[in-house]
UniProtKB/Swiss-Prot annotation:
Origin organism lineage: Bacteria, Bacillati, Cyanobacteriota, Cyanophyceae, Nostocales
Subcellular location: Cell inner membrane
Reaction(s) catalysed (UniProt annotation): di-trans,octa-cis-undecaprenyl diphospho-N-acetyl-alpha-D-muramoyl-L-alanyl-D-glutamyl-meso-2,6-diaminopimeloyl-D-alanyl-D-alanine + UDP-N-acetyl-alpha-D-glucosamine = di-trans,octa-cis-undecaprenyl diphospho-[N-acetyl-alpha-D-glucosaminyl-(1->4)]-N-acetyl-alpha-D-muramoyl-L-alanyl-D-glutamyl-meso-2,6-diaminopimeloyl-D-alanyl-D-alanine + UDP + H(+)
Organism for this UniProt entry: Nostoc punctiforme (strain ATCC 29133 / PCC 73102)
Functional summary from the UniProt entry: Cell wall formation. Catalyzes the transfer of a GlcNAc subunit on undecaprenyl-pyrophosphoryl-MurNAc-pentapeptide (lipid intermediate I) to form undecaprenyl-pyrophosphoryl-MurNAc-(pentapeptide)GlcNAc (lipid intermediate II).
The protein's name in its UniProt record: UDP-N-acetylglucosamine--N-acetylmuramyl-(pentapeptide) pyrophosphoryl-undecaprenol N-acetylglucosamine transferase
Length: 357
């Protein structure tokens, strides 16, 4: 009689940065029976493939200070742990994988209280508070950036990189764009991750005329929360809320302007795309600046602080790079050197080693 397939619960919720690496891992474990743990009305309800049944729980993060709201959250956390324990026991799961965030706490506590192994993936250069607290409890902590290990001295750390979506690795990276971009013209791609970046959008629109005059085209992925997304009209400017074929778009790009979330940086690295990075200033513990530092110190990107940034500064930095093709080429090479293209395979192998032994 054949052995029953391994059953794995993946706890990943909230943003593309948490979800895309988890989906990439799941695709590398076709022999596993995988279910998902998420939160109602979050991005996972749209992104997680239907082949992975989605279980949802109510969970919140902790804010500064302690008061009645914290007591309420503690109560909800306790209820979430009980609910995850029920899911794990009823589903006969043999392990848990998580990418952090609010969902990780109840997932790790519930799994470890039942004696189940947990693999935690941390994609950022500065591990989040949840990772720093729960990392030592886990069977292994997989790191996207090697520098993160110094913040997790008591965890069992393994650097595997951060998995990217399959489109970045399966040949789509060289597929043609279905956008009206002439061959040979400089292309600036602006994107703010899965949540967009309204402040960056405004600066780009104010800067773009000089780029058009220099012959560049701009593909601007504005997200879906920018009320002025359609305010700029120009034949060399394409504004879209999102674009599905990001691999081909970044491969074609002469230069990217981006936030520095770990997922976005991983995609830039795999494509070898030089970038100007504008870290999101309100990210938890300013972790996007730590991510950007990895790329800047490697010569793969230029980092500009949003608090000091004006349209004129952004405009001139872009023009300087467009006029320096050798510098752009070197930045692209350095970005590609950071990439771990087989990250999903390495992470899947780690999960197998932890769960099956």
């Amino acid at each position: 009689m054949a052995n029953a397939p391994i059953r794995l619960l993946i706890a990943a919720s909230g943003t593309g940065g948490h979800l895309f690496p988890a989906i990439a891992l799941a695709e590398k474990l076709p022999d596993y029976q995988i279910e998902w743990l998420g939160v109602p009305n979050r991005l996972e309800t749209q992104l997680v493939p239907k082949e992975y049944p989605l279980n949802t729980i109510a969970v919140e993060g902790f804010q500064q200070g302690f008061g009645l709201s914290s007591i309420r959250i503690f109560g909800k956390l306790a209820g979430s742990i009980i609910e995850v324990r029920r899911i794990l026991k009823q589903g006969n799961f043999q392990g848990v994988f998580t990418t952090g965030g609010y969902i990780a706490g109840p997932a790790v506590i519930a799994a470890r209280s039942l004696g189940l192994p947990v693999v935690f993936h941390e994609s950022n250069a500065l591990p989040g508070k949840v990772t720093r607290f729960f990392g030592p409890w886990c069977s292994a902590v997989a790191l996207g950036f090697e520098v993160a290990a110094k913040y997790l001295p008591r965890a069992k750390n393994v650097c595997v990189g951060t998995p990217v979506r399959g489109q970045f690795l399966d040949g789509a990276i060289n597929s043609p764009l279905d956008l009206a971009i002439p061959d040979g013209v400089p292309l600036i791609v602006v994107f703010g991750g899965s949540q967009g970046a309204v402040a960056v959008n405004k600066l780009v629109r104010e800067s773009a005329k000089a780029w058009f005059d220099a012959g560049a085209y701009v593909v601007h992925l504005t997200g879906d929360r920018d009320p002025e997304a359609d305010s700029l009209k120009h034949p060399q400017y394409i504004a879209l809320p999102f674009y599905n074929n990001m691999a081909a778009l970044l491969q074609r790009a002469t230069l990217a302007i981006s936030r520095s979330g770990a997922g976005s940086l991983t995609e830039l690295a795999v494509c070898g795309t030089p970038a100007i990075l504008i870290p999101y200033p309100f990210a938890a513990e300013d972790h996007q600046s730590y991510n950007a530092d990895v790329f800047t110190s490697s010569g793969a990107a230029l980092t500009l602080k949003q608090s000091e940034l004006t349209a004129q500064i952004l405009q001139s930095n872009v023009l300087n790079l467009l006029q320096s093709p050798q510098e752009l080429a070197k930045m692209g090479e350095n970005a590609h050197a950071i990439a771990v293209p087989d990250s999903a395979e390495k992470l899947a192998q780690l999960v197998r080693e932890v769960v099956e032994t």
